[in-house]
Amino acid sequence: MPRAVLVVDDNEFIRRALCRSFTLEADFRVCGEAENGKEAIEKAQKSLPSVIVMDLSMPVMNGIDAARVLKTLMPGVPLIIFSEYADASSENEARLAGISALVSKSAHISVLLEKVRRLWGPIAA
């Protein structure tokens, strides 16, 4: 059974590209999209994702603030920040908020896909 991914990014082009990338992989399915942290919290509670991939810098509520709330509501769901702001300071703040991993948007999409796979582990056959 494919892992359910919630994709969160305020940039529609990036959000759609991420959704397409996950959809093309047999071991993932996109269970929802959101354009900010507040919307991510609402959609996560309805769609019950296996993993959340989220931007750091978004309007309304950023990825760090959303992660703090999501970790309280869904402590077992891995949260991955996919952001252009992937420096040491951002990574430290993200880890303190409960983020499982931080991947730079400048990395190839395969880096993100592999990170999600490693965090969640293999799918039982």
Task: State the predicted function of each range.
Residues 47-53:
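Active-site beta3 strand of CheY-like receiver
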Residues 27-35, 43:
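Short hydrophobic/Thr-rich beta-strand motif most characteristic of the beta2 strand and flanking loop
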Residues 36-39, 62-65:
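Acidic catalytic/metal-coordinating carboxylates
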Residues 58:
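Receiver (REC) domain active-site loop signature in two-component systems and cognate sites
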Residues 65, 86-103, 107-114, 118:
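Alpha4 helix (beta4-alpha4-beta5 surface) of REC/receiver domains from two-component response regulators
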Residues 2-14, 18-22:
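Conserved acidic segment of CheY-like receiver
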Residues 8-9, 34, 52:
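Conserved sequence signature across two-component system core domains
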